[in-house]
From Swiss-Prot:
Keywords: Coiled coil, Cytoplasm, Mitochondrion, Repeat, Ribonucleoprotein, Ribosomal protein, RNA-binding, rRNA-binding, Transit peptide, Translation regulation, tRNA-binding. Pfam families: MRP-S27. Residues 369-415 form a coiled coil. Residues 1-17 form a transit peptide. GO terms for biological process: cell population proliferation; mitochondrial translation; regulation of translation. It comes from the Eukaryota. It is found in: Cytoplasm; Mitochondrion. The keyword DNA damage does not apply. It comes from Mus musculus. This is Small ribosomal subunit protein mS27.
Amino acid sequence: MAAPMVRCGMLLARRLDASRLCLAGKRCLLSAAYVDSHQWEAREKEEYHLADLASLMDKAYERKLPVSSLSISRFVDNIASREDLDSAEYYLYKFRHSPNCWYLRDWTIHSWIRQCLKYGAQDKALYTLVNKVQYGIFPDNFTFNLLMDYFIKKGNYKDALSVVFEIMMQEAFDVPSTQFLSLYVLYRCLAEKTELTWEEERDFGASLLLSGLKQRNTVGLSSQLYGYALLGKVELQRGVRAVYHGMPLMWTPGYLDRALQVMERVASSPEDLKLGREVLDVLDGVLKVVTSPDVQTSEAQPQEGEDGLGSANLVEQLDTEEPEQSKLPRYLERFQASRSKLQELNRVESESLLTLTTQLVKEKLPACEAEDLATYEQKLREWHLERVQLIQREQEQREKAKQEYQALSAAEKAA
């Protein structure tokens, strides 16, 4: 009875921590300058009627001819209503399944997401992002940030989390601002969840791990530990294939061992590094779960409909899981020793990870915004030059085709 009450108290504290971030005004995470669209809207763009572009693309597809990346770009740029988005979605799908699919421009993807947000179709933006293979929507970090921040400010953390999972799948945690936003969303969502499915444990684990790898601070190191702990639990209960299959993760067993290595590195580091008490409790709970007799006897039972695990995967499980199971007693000893050492060195942070992440976002995000905006402005200039070159090439090809046609017509008349 005491455990659920403690859990409820932790959840309440986390929710209060989350609310502090939005108390002062409307600004939650990204500033108004970051999400402002005036610079984007003021760019030089070509005016076209969507009906003309649609007719042009339809004729090209009917005749099995390639559709230019400029055509789909012009269509997306000239969207003027919510209804136009439906047509644009159709042509994005068609373009993705055409021979020219590799040439969908980055600025077209950026424009598509902005148009969806502009006309209240954030659900369509998320749908095409999640179904990226069908639509070719692979945004850059700035675009990811805009979409994440939009959902955060709407209080829609479920969809914000879906964006984070897509960032994880695309391995796009290269920019600090994306790391901070993602970590905030992850801990905000974990604050609301009392239980996770094994698929959620895998997705949360991978996202926490990859977003925390480049942060050498309490939040980053705790996120690495949290991620390894959740992935280690999945590995022990479902097999290492369930961890790496379809995920940007290593297929080498030993995720719990890697979690313990994080603890040991922090404990032996000359720097004043700390780990969150919360994540140590998580790893403690994982170790207790995977060492319980019920779990160990149920692990060997194949799960019905689980990715069609065949005899080859069964051999893999027998080869990899048994050694990990035999290491669990040593893992427990290492965990207890490292935790004691961390406590002796005063390297255990009592604040919740959501509170720590919120503080980190407030402290670091403004400087990250300045870097992102400078990069974005440079990217706008590069996109403009690339577009100008494509338009020039298009005009040259049209002129060449016109001359060839005229020469052919003249030859036919002469004959």
